Amino acid sequence: GLGDVYKRQMEGLFVVDVDGQIQNGLCDSYEVSDDQKTYTFHIRDNAKWSDGTPVTAQDFEYAWKRNATAQGDYSKFTYQIEMAAIKNYEAVTSGEADADELGVTAVDDNTLQVELEYPVPFFLNLLTFSPWAPVKESKLTEEGDQFGVDKDSVLYCGAYTLDQWDVGGNTIVLKKNPDYWDAENVDVDEIDLVVISDTQQAVMAYQNGDVDNVTLTGDMVS
């Protein structure tokens, strides 16, 4: 799905591997306080954006505070953010508190500290979802309302960059990101995704060898 496409381009602190296990993404290491309410994450020294600049703790702080103050319909992501129980989140989203009071702090370029209202045993699981990816503030400011509308208006920090995407078209092409921190272990140089709205046609394309992978609906699995 499109969520998987996004995760290939934008990596967060943690990722889920092919076996469904949580692995470190842009997080090199972390500590948790005895009361399980304070997490300290250390960003990889070699984590980079696709323009070659470092991914920093400030990029995560900016993105997460932006999530709490964003306007518009983000209902599909809201539950993922609310369940994290970050300190003062409700007060910030309601306007009772400023975004600076959210429990997310970039201690330095490579250290992100997060305070929770109460222990959340699945907190690291939540951090594998899309809303927790970093955003480079200077790029967003530069692009303004054009941020994200085409492949060149975004910086990528995942294994792939968006190489081709035509709005309204049916093909998405991803290219290996040479600036990705683990690029040497990315074996596939290009991924071509074809949008086929009819599931039967998609299955036929798979059977004919036109595509390598297809998503099935529940009634087609036996």
Q: What residue ranges belong to the model's regions?
A:
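N-terminal lobe/hinge region of extracytoplasmic solute-binding protein
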Residues: G1-D34, L155
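Surface-exposed binding/hinge segments that line
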Residues: E61, S75-S138
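Ligand-site clamp/hinge motif
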Residues: P178-S222
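Sec-exported extracytoplasmic/periplasmic mature domains
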Residues: F14-V18, D45-K48, K65-D73, P119-P121, ...
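Structural recognition of the beta-strand scaffold that forms the well-ordered cores
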Residues: Y39-H42, L112, V173, D192-V195, ...
